[in-house]
């Protein structure tokens, strides 16, 4: 698998709503009505999950797996169903529904293994529970040349004219899904209470069925009633649980906090940052009234719809059917589960607890389907009625259509609650696609939003970006500021005033910290508001635009849109150089962007042009990266010092032992023998101390002609070649000694220190240092600790002025002294002892 980051690919095939009452599980609604023909499915792939065997013996529902939050649990009824499926080997059937050209011919592999046969009596009975014996679907073997019409389950998908299949009673086409009768899915996708608020996942061939089942509490309620405490009143539902920074894992004992409002403190602010631009609040009193009257509302509606069916719902499960690629299975299923499945189910749980929403809508949908069955309504007509008359069916339809297109799904569940769901889009990539990778032209090409060792010392190259934006970033709006302000002000909501104020203060040339200092808005609030705008695709976080930075035409820009972009650019900047001319100028030798600005009067206008180019992915910032180079000379000096230390340590230990032996001998009875031994030993030590008679390994060698080839501390380190220190912030013991040796060689007085003083004694070294050249006159030993942490090859050197609060000219003078190579000619007198960096430039 390529390391290139990929944009969201929901792989969404269908959404299924399963409810369970005392009468048993029921497949209430699914969308689209015929996933095999109505979904734009990817072509058949040979690299489908090979771990799932293609013979009938291995055809079974994969073990329902839970994530870390779920632990291990299983459903005995599902196991029984799996054994039933396993008992039929090499069975075949044909799925109903036409598959258009270019779609997977295998129909997810279901037709290669399973043949469904309903009882001759007509419609199969719904089982009272998953483990009940009645209503079980029978499986049988079929020949390879068996007629498609023999399978009434398959034929039902094509019956939109009201005629019965194979002479049997009428079976509506909406009572089968993916070629299988509804009662099969009702049993399979209705788990036991052990799966309450856990990731429920079933794999069938190429498909993954993932849900977040919610069960009623033992006391008959859907939320745990909190104890009354005198606390600050909080908002009950602002869509906060729908945020991108929400914890993906639920606390096991969290019964009602999962959808019941924002957390306190900073976490609450960040959660609130992801509400929709038009949130509708539900007050606490309304929630209590709705929750208290939910039973009455449910009973009244049930009486109206079906006087004989007065049972209540005990479980609902919104199941998403996914078809992810083999190599991206875990990543794709996780992003859909974390961002869509779990949050949608939480919102439904909230409304179910408040107004009995899910059960009322399920009853309403069932009532409409029964009427359609009596009238033998066509499938398309029924679904038009359902989406028009049922808010839950319309919500499922909206989620499917929007998420399948990688768009934001704005779902109004009721007049009081409106939620927005999305899979956060990929806004940038640090990689250019390879020959076998799918290209995404126009995607912002940069490493600016990657986690670096300075931001997180424990992070590595493949760590995901931080959810909380760093204070040194700036905000680049992806739409016209006036248009965004109009939307915000028209939407109302808790965040609208703060968002409008921040948008008026924000500039792409100012970091969040600078905006906070100038506007008085707390930094945490700015980060929260910026995260809100970034998450909802209204803005992008970028390094602040500066005239001293260098920008180039992005290698990933989408030149196929040049003609359209040229017209839009001309409309925005009619009196300035055209888009092709700007791109041509930026394609030349890289130089600071300020060199393209004709005068100070054009500065703001040219910054607006640069923001426009960045917004469309036409240009990217060319940034500098550096690492510390260790020469063989440094390595040899450190190695000689290390070996000398070992010899000295050995000699000190020998002297200590000999002194102790001499002391013990003087106190003994045989003084003469001890005196001889002492004399002999002293003579030996004297010869060792002189280094003339006793040879020792690694003895003082001539530094001018060393014969060492590998380090004593690290036998894999060659002393005859140069090396780079990859991560100075976590250097090894040997690398630390190299760094100490490098610093010890820095001169005490820079060569140019005396040339940049003011006053009469400037030539003699007296007078004050000119602030303009302070970086050239300060000893490098004093500057080194501030800069070394950025020399890891991952942190851009352009970050240093912003993060350290230093002037850019000062920083670049220091970096030039250290060996940074730039395109500009430098008049700084360099000292070879300070030239320790190896630098590169890229995005």
Swiss-Prot record:
Residues 62-73, 84-106, 677-693 have a biased composition (Low complexity). InterPro entries: HTH_NPRL3, Npr3. Residues 30-174, 222-272, 657-706, 749-768 are annotated as: Disordered. Residues 43-52, 223-234 have a biased composition (Basic residues). GO terms for biological process: cellular response to amino acid starvation; meiotic cell cycle; negative regulation of TORC1 signaling; positive regulation of autophagy. It comes from the Eukaryota. Transmembrane segments: none annotated. Residues 248-258, 667-676 have a biased composition (Acidic residues). Pfam families: HTH_NPRL3, NPR3. Residues 1-23 form the signal peptide. GO terms for cellular component: GATOR1 complex. Keywords: Meiosis, Signal. The keyword Signal applies. Residues 259-269 have a biased composition (Gly residues). Residues 235-247 have a biased composition (Basic and acidic residues). Mediates inactivation of the TORC1 complex in response to amino acid starvation. Required for meiotic nuclear division. PANTHER family: CGTHBA PROTEIN -14 GENE PROTEIN (PTHR13153), GATOR COMPLEX PROTEIN NPRL3 (PTHR13153:SF5). Belongs to the NPR3 family. This is Nitrogen permease regulator 3. The lineage of its organism: Eukaryota, Fungi, Dikarya, Ascomycota, Pezizomycotina. The gene is npr3.
